[in-house]
Amino acid sequence: FREELRKLGEYDNTDYSYLNDVELTDYLKRDLTGLVGDERVIQQCVNQTVSRVHQSMEAFVHNMNTIHSRGGNQVVFSSINYGTDTSAEGRCVIREILNTTYEGVGNGSTAIFPIQIWKKKRGVSYLPEDPNYDLYKYACKVTARRFFPNFLNLDATYNQDADWDPQDPKRYVHEVATMGCRTRVFDNKFGPRTSIGRGNLSFTTINIVRLAIECMGIENKEERIAT
């Protein structure tokens, strides 16, 4: 936003730096018709900012589906978790990643990566009066068309953290996240519970049905378990 103010000031030969710290409740594109003075300047810069954020999200999704950097022949299996940032800037990023996902890539194809996870939380996006409820509804519309985002319930007993505070700008530290399509990242035997700076070294898939088929003919329980 500040960069757009500077660029507009250079074009108009006007110093708009006094608007650098103007409080914005949301970044939404609007028609400039009928707007004058500072209101028009602010909205024009907001419009440009939203366009740049959208283009950045398009580039991000495109790169995650085209850059082969995993063993040299596979795109990165990437995941992003979002939904609890209620700041104007955070909501803008969330809205534009959802817009990009809804539109699709290329000729309208569904992007496989990054895997997207919406974190749903009471007081944030659970009820109509919550600040991000509008984005949650849009996320539902996007997932109905594109399969993403998936949804993670932060209010589930095993996902709750007593240190989570809606007024804490770093509350994401106390939020569960998921990686890929199977890994829940939060619990920690050797330190505080958090998803920040965490990951997995490898993944394991157990074919329980196959194990049952292989053991179904073994009558002795101990031998069956050992097998």
What are these regions (language model features)?
Residues 1-227:
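Conserved catalytic cores of very large enzyme subunits
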